């Protein structure tokens, strides 16, 4: 048919004085100029810890919200914030190496596998930036609660201790405020007691108005941020700029 007549040639004329010939030639020259990047890769500078066993443990916990833990939405907000800023992202589980990255996010890392706290500690001490959210480091790999405070094994790294987690009704809204900025909060509000961490944002409403909603702690050569609440997407765009 007609497809066989036209599909495999530049044209039927055979000369060099046509627009199509010139454009095909220019395309070939451009591809030669790009030969040096053939096979090259772009190394991600950021990573997100996303662990299926931790998610399963959260879903099996039957709380603190019986409906709507919003775990995957939280992961998507972190990822979306990074990608909107043009940052390449790798997804890791807790068995993988962190040292290849400049910044690592751990959204709702409820379950800590053995050794992850030491891995995070070393990453921050060696100069990395680690961002952890509320409801992290609560149970071990056997789904048994840690004793002594959360986030388990990292309270000195983050310069704080989580004291309680408030679960909001669907219609409830709080906010994190600071430095002239306000970010909407829904679903979860972690109440923390700081021990060296700097408060960057504070809760606006409820009995914990003024409590930290976002903190930063310098540990070794690096920095550890603790996101105390379920913030809106715009918060993560701002956080990555901090």
Regions found by a protein language model. Give the residues of each.
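Carbohydrate-binding surfaces of carbohydrate-active enzymes
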Residues: 1-241
């Amino acid at each position: 048919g007609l497809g066989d007549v036209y599909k495999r040639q530049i044209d039927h004329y055979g000369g060099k004085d046509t627009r199509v010939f010139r454009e095909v030639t220019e395309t070939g020259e451009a591809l030669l100029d790009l030969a040096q990047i053939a096979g090259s890769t772009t190394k991600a500078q950021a990573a997100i810890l996303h662990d299926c066993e931790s998610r399963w443990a959260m879903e099996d916990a039957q709380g603190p919200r019986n409906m709507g833990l919003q775990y995957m939405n939280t992961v998507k907000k972190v990822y979306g914030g990074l990608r909107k800023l043009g940052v390449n992202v790798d997804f890791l589980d807790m068995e993988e190496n962190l040292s290849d990255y400049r910044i690592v996010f751990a959204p709702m890392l409820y379950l800590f596998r053995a050794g992850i706290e030491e891995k995070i500690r070393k990453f921050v001490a060696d100069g990395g930036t680690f961002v952890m959210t509320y409801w992290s480091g609560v149970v071990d790999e056997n789904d048994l609660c840690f004793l002594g405070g959360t986030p388990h094994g990292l309270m000195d790294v983050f310069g704080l201790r989580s004291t309680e987690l408030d679960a909001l009704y669907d219609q409830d809204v709080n906010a994190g405020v600071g430095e002239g900025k306000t970010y909407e909060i829904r679903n979860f509000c972690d109440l923390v007691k700081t021990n060296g961490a700097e408060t960057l944002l504070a809760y606006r409403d409820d009995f914990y108005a003024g409590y930290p909603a976002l903190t930063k702690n310098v540990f070794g050569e690096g920095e550890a941020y603790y996101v105390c609440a379920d913030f809106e997407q715009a918060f993560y765009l701002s956080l990555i700029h901090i």
